[in-house]
UniProtKB/Swiss-Prot annotation:
It catalyses: uridine(54) in tRNA + (6R)-5,10-methylene-5,6,7,8-tetrahydrofolate + NADH + H(+) = 5-methyluridine(54) in tRNA + (6S)-5,6,7,8-tetrahydrofolate + NAD(+); uridine(54) in tRNA + (6R)-5,10-methylene-5,6,7,8-tetrahydrofolate + NADPH + H(+) = 5-methyluridine(54) in tRNA + (6S)-5,6,7,8-tetrahydrofolate + NADP(+). GO terms for biological process: tRNA methylation; tRNA wobble uridine modification. NCBIfam families: gid_trmFO, PRK05335.1. It comes from the Bacteria. Its EC number is 2.1.1.74. GO terms for molecular function: flavin adenine dinucleotide binding; tRNA (uracil(54)-C5)-methyltransferase activity, 5,10-methylenetetrahydrofolate-dependent. FAD binds at residues 10-15. This is Methylenetetrahydrofolate--tRNA-(uracil-5-)-methyltransferase TrmFO.
Length: 434
């Protein structure tokens, strides 16, 4: 066993995964987490891998790229996916979790590993020696300044928004119905149907509602996958009807007809007492937010247990700075992982931590860091953030468009996606024991 210690900074999804992967390979880890000594604007607990946006890790089937990346991670013994599987709540074809149980489980697995030492303090300078930086989109100002100095260039920044959560008991169940879109999987969503008149009233209130003012020096750049609902609405009346409020596949069983618009609620905890409003990330002020949400049929008297909030995200220009091993180009023993690398999403962040952790462990053991081929989901993400055009670099979710092309063209989308998935999983099995 090597006597070298790897520093991991940040115990979010990526940092927790990186620490676990390093530790299970017989290498000592010093895991730094500034919470609860210093909180972020979006976190509420001192637990590892706290989910601050949705409680969904998105699709869990192999017909979707994020489902493939999950399966790759299962094969690679991901602590994040193991905990998610153990803490899952009903969500149709998606993998959603009880966020409190999930964070507690990840904390338990990582903290109790004999090779992990947890240090609760804020890191303001990049340590010497093998280090994985996984401080996430809410990196503290002091460390951000250090990273800016290290990279020699400005960060990009944008905002992610968290959706409101309501108590199930406060929902008028006579006005909503249980159904998944196109009846896929189990009926896991509560649906609030709207007539055109109800939608118009809601829409006008939404676009007129007061938002939390942003600081003057901060430019608004929103990532499409977690865009505030009021920003979507500002793009035009139909944006919501074709976006988070699209009614297709959600016929009202009482009428047999498709509503004009539908607001979906997804179970947020294992007990089924809390539901989040799908796609309704927002930074409306709390008073106006409550007024707007109570215009949704079934939510007229909704008890909001968590209002939607807004927080800043930060990411580096990875194509200029990183190798596909997640190593910093100018320093072999410095790794980056998580959303700050430009991977977007819970699962993608954890996947980057998995690969960064494996490679940090390999480096200190005198082994070559591994580059996963872009025929795999994890390899395609690493390839995207390091090989795409640096000038227009933007965060990206896992998707089949990032995969290396198939040898033979397949016209039908379902068959093509199946071929991508089969090839990816066949390939990743060659890396299970790295």
């Amino acid at each position: 066993m090597t006597t070298q210690v790897v520093n991991v900074i940040g115990a979010g999804l990526a940092g927790s995964e990186a620490a676990y992967q390093i530790a299970k390979r017989g290498v000592q880890v010093r895991l730094y987490e500034m919470r609860p000594v210093r909180q972020t604007p979006a976190h509420h607990t001192d637990k590892f891998a706290e989910l601050v946006c949705s409680n969904s890790l998105r699709a869990n089937t192999l017909t979707n790229a994020v489902g493939v990346i999950k399966e790759e991670m299962r094969l690679m013994d991901s602590v994040i996916i193991r905990a998610a599987d153990e803490c899952s709540v009903p969500a149709g074809g998606a993998l959603a979790v009880d966020r409190h149980e999930f964070a507690a489980k990840v904390t338990e697995y990582v903290k109790n590993h004999p090779n992990v030492t947890v240090v609760n303090e804020e890191i303001t300078k990049i340590p010497e020696g093998p280090t994985v930086i996984a401080t996430g989109p809410l990196t503290s100002p002091d460390l951000s300044a250090q990273l800016k100095e290290l990279t020699g260039e400005d960060y990009f920044y944008f905002y992610d928004a968290a959706a409101p959560i309501v108590e199930k008991d406060s929902i008028d169940m006579n006005k909503v119905y249980l159904k998944s879109r196109y009846d896929k999987g189990e009926a896991a969503y509560l649906n609030c149907p709207m007539t055109e008149e109800e939608f118009d009233r809601f829409y006008e209130a939404l676009i007129a509602a007061e938002t939390v003012p942003l600081k003057e020096f901060e430019k608004e750049i929103f990532f499409e996958g977690c865009m505030p609902v009021e920003v979507m609405a500002s793009r035009g009346r139909q944006t919501l009807v074709f976006g988070p409020m699209k009614p297709v596949g959600l016929e009202d069983p009482k009428t047999g007809k498709t509503p004009y618009a539908v607001v979906q609620l997804r179970q947020d905890d294992a007990a089924g007492t809390l539901y989040n409003i799908v796609g309704f990330q927002t930074h409306l002020k709390w008073g106006p937010q409550k007024e707007v949400l109570q215009l949704i049929p079934g939510l007229e008297n909704a008890e909001i247990v968590r209002y939607g909030v807004m927080h800043r995200n930060t990411f580096i220009n990875s194509p200029n700075l990183l190798r596909p091993t997640y190593q910093y180009k100018q320093r072999d023993d410095l790794f980056f992982a998580g959303q700050m690398t430009g991977v977007e999403g819970y699962v993608e962040s954890a996947a980057s931590g998995l690969l960064a952790g494996i490679n940090a462990a390999r480096l200190v053991k005198g082994e070559e860091p591994v580059v996963l081929p872009p025929v795999t989901a994890m390899g395609s993400m690493a390839n995207y953030i390091t090989a795409t055009n640096a000038k227009n670099f933007q965060p990206m979710n896992a998707n089949f468009g990032l995969f290396a092309p198939l040898e033979k063209k397949i016209k039908k989308k379902a068959e093509r996606n199946e071929a991508y998935a089969t090839r990816a999983l066949e390939t990743i099995r060659n890396f299970v024991n790295i």
